[in-house]
């Protein structure tokens, strides 16, 4: 049985990925930070999967927690086939670089880039022994080309660095049957993070995307599930955008 480790997998986009992988028969270790209610809701939604589901509390900005999460996954299920780096802090306040505090800057880098480095270091040796692995990171529209993103300098810098790291790992680990790809969700907000595509289509015309509907957690989960398949090994080192045609990073740009 293939096993997935997903950070922040109990709610939002992560929950939809967790549910999709469970539906495919995989076992999943779900990391969460502190929301026990979200864990309870996910357990209630998947009563027949509890023998394939493990929850591990931890803060992805802390190296010791990341190592403990990876160890828990390996100890319980004996392998880690898929590493889904879903967690990543984000500052919603819109402000320019000069207005960031040091803590905010380093928090963005630690949570969105260094955390992934530590998980890579822990999980890649396991995948090498298996001669199989699928690594997924998250980015934003245009991350592969290092665009400027007004009022999102710290987050943008971390994710652009992560795009390069993802592509590098794809090259370095290809000989071991390991692929690495970045998925870039569009403007998926609120309850749409846990929504289905069908639910989004019921709201066609109410969204500002060119396709007429919002992106959903299911959109992202379907892409990730495909990338995790054994026969998806030809797809590696890619940055895949799922935006519905919306120009996400420039929609609020005025200067």
Swiss-Prot record:
The keyword Oxidoreductase applies. One of its GO terms (molecular function) is oxidoreductase activity, acting on the CH-OH group of donors, NAD or NADP as acceptor. The keyword Oxidoreductase applies. Coiled coil: none annotated. This is Putative oxidoreductase YtkK. It comes from Bacillus subtilis (strain 168). GO terms for biological process: fatty acid elongation. Its EC number is 1.-.-.-. CDD domains: SDR_c (cd05233). Keywords: Oxidoreductase. NAD(+) binds at residues 7-14. Belongs to the short-chain dehydrogenases/reductases (SDR) family.
């Amino acid at each position: 049985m293939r096993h997935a480790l997903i950070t922040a997998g109990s709610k939002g986009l992560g929950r939809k990925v967790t549910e999709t992988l469970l539906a495919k028969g995989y076992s999943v270790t779900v990391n969460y930070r502190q929301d026990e209610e979200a864990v309870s809701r996910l357990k209630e939604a998947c009563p027949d999967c509890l023998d394939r589901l493990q929850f591990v509390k931890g803060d992805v900005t802390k190296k010791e927690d990341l190592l403990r999460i990876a160890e828990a996954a390996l100890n319980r299920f004996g392998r880690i086939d898929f590493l889904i780096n879903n967690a990543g802090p984000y500052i919603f306040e819109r402000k320019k670089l000069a207005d960031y505090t040091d803590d905010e800057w380093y928090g963005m880098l630690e949570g969105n880039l260094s955390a992934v480095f530590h998980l890579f270091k822990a999980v890649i040796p396991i995948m090498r022994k298996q001669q199989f692995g699928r690594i997924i990171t998250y980015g934003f529209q245009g991350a592969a080309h290092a665009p400027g993103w007004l009022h999102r300098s710290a987050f943008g810098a971390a994710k652009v660095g992560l795009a390069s790291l993802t592509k590098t790992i794809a090259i370095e680990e290809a000989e071991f049957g390991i692929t690495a790809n970045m998925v870039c969700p569009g403007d998926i907000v609120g309850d749409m993070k846990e929504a289905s595509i069908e639910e989004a289509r019921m709201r066609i015309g109410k969204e500002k995307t060119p396709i007429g509907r919002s992106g959903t957690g299911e959109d992202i989960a379907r892409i990730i599930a495909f990338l995790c398949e054994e026969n998806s090994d030809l797809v590696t080192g890619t940055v895949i955008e799922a935006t519905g045609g919306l120009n996400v990073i420039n929609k609020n740009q005025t200067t």
